Swiss-Prot record:
Species whose genome carries this gene: Homo sapiens
Name of the protein in its database record: Guanylate-binding protein 4
EC assignment: 3.6.5.-
Stretches for region GTPase domain (Globular): 1-325
Record family assignment: Belongs to the TRAFAC class dynamin-like GTPase superfamily. GB1/RHD3 GTPase family. GB1 subfamily.
Gene name as annotated: GBP4
Amino acid sequence: MGERTLHAAVPTPGYPESESIMMAPICLVENQEEQLTVNSKALEILDKISQPVVVVAIVGLYRTGKSYLMNRLAGKRNGFPLGSTVQSETKGIWMWCVPHLSKPNHTLVLLDTEGLGDVEKSNPKNDSWIFALAVLLSSSFVYNSVSTINHQALEQLHYVTELAELIRAKSCPRPDEAEDSSEFASFFPDFIWTVRDFTLELKLDGNPITEDEYLENALKLIPGKNPKIQNSNMPRECIRHFFRKRKCFVFDRPTNDKQYLNHMDEVPEENLERHFLMQSDNFCSYIFTHAKTKTLREGIIVTGKRLGTLVVTYVDAINSGAVPCLENAVTALAQLENPAAVQRAADHYSQQMAQQLRLPTDTLQELLDVHAACEREAIAVFMEHSFKDENHEFQKKLVDTIEKKKGDFVLQNEEASAKYCQAELKRLSEHLTESILRGIFSVPGGHNLYLEEKKQVEWDYKLVPRKGVKANEVLQNFLQSQVVVEESILQSDKALTAGEKAIAAERAMKEAAEKEQELLREKQKEQQQMMEAQERSFQEYMAQMEKKLEEERENLLREHERLLKHKLKVQEEMLKEEFQKKSEQLNKEINQLKEKIESTKNEQLRLLKILDMASNIMIVTLPGASKLLGVGTKYLGSRI
């Protein structure tokens, strides 16, 4: 693999400017004086990454060459300190964010952890926390060891047996449920065991085997009931139970020259063993191709920003003496992400309305049609970026925000229309106004002359395009301003008899009344259009909410089914290995999963309750609430 040159905060093709590229790793979680702290500068970097992340964490005993593999993934010869001396270099967890080579619009986050089992550490408990954090944060978890996967190697992996005490899936598990750790496999990362300086032949009973088969054979339980054997089996059991997907890579010794081994980052590749380089490339190729995007339960995609929140939440829990809990972390994440989802959706609405609207619109309906399209997109943005909005608190905020913004656009439209119409009417009536001031109509027959010129103004005004929603109201105000003038001209017209004047006055009053009625009908029509727009908003929110709930249900169902498949596979393997009792112990977990799957398949009543709650919030929040009651009842009725 050629070296990839990276520059700090320089955008590359396919890598948005907001996603800054790191020139070198930075400490993410510092382990100083037996205290874990999150580095604020590292959080600033994560905060700028809005892309989904693929998180690869590596752990292992100190001085086993972990950092070399991570530098290789970053496309650099050096970066993570290799720690070739007796003193281990990496303290805490170090992070390097680079563009993903094979997943467009994704960021690869590499996490290198301090070596486990360092004799200089006064508190070995921190090793356990580093191990647990690496599991919680990663989508691919790499365990690095030396020589072979034997009894000693598995004993050194005792940290995996402590995970049940260091991690919680749920904040308040029910007493009748299986152990909390039974759910680990639903959200734990893929497990990759890398074995360095491997000298054995990959054979079993004289037959060639793959690296993966070598790992699975090493994880088989040892028969026997004495405590020593049971302790030896614990890491094997935990790895098989907790990690659904497992992979193994073995590496030859990179070189036999000890001097080179101490300075691997400075050794030209031609001086390293060719087979070792091929094995390293295979490992990197697998990561780039198969390492998954980091997700939380129910398919919540983790971005760089979200990863930063998770780090802080987990480390805060550890420092407070509590146990990091996935459910609590997701809740904390939702409280930060959901307001941002509301803002993002509202901004999208404003931007699209501003781009698509040409004020003044010819009719109110034209504006409402654009509003409906922009609102639909904004709701989709909110649904995509929000989660765990269980009380619909943030959905209500979005409804409120968009309604206010819509009201602002309606007001701007009215103001633009009124301003334009007044200017046009003033221009068209200039000659009429001048004639009145000069007394042109104060002559016998002047009333007819006045009416003709006024009618011409009205006709010319009618021909003005795109006057907008205030066209009639502005005209009506203008005509109203002419009533006294017309009455004065009429009374002073000596060419008309008293009877003709009375008829003319009555005709003027009738025309004015008709104009008033026309204006009233127009306002009623607009009110009806606004009400219909509210109904469309209600229908759109409810439809997208229903779609999101259905997607969440399907995600949960797939999650349960994958976990059930994994449990059944473990149970089958236990039976094959003649561990009947351990196989039977899985029955409770398997039966509970089957019940959850059936319950999830038939969740219509629960979904209807959620939709009913959302419907009630929508009805109260949207203007014209009482008129929407029937719409809500009809919508829910159609879903029963």
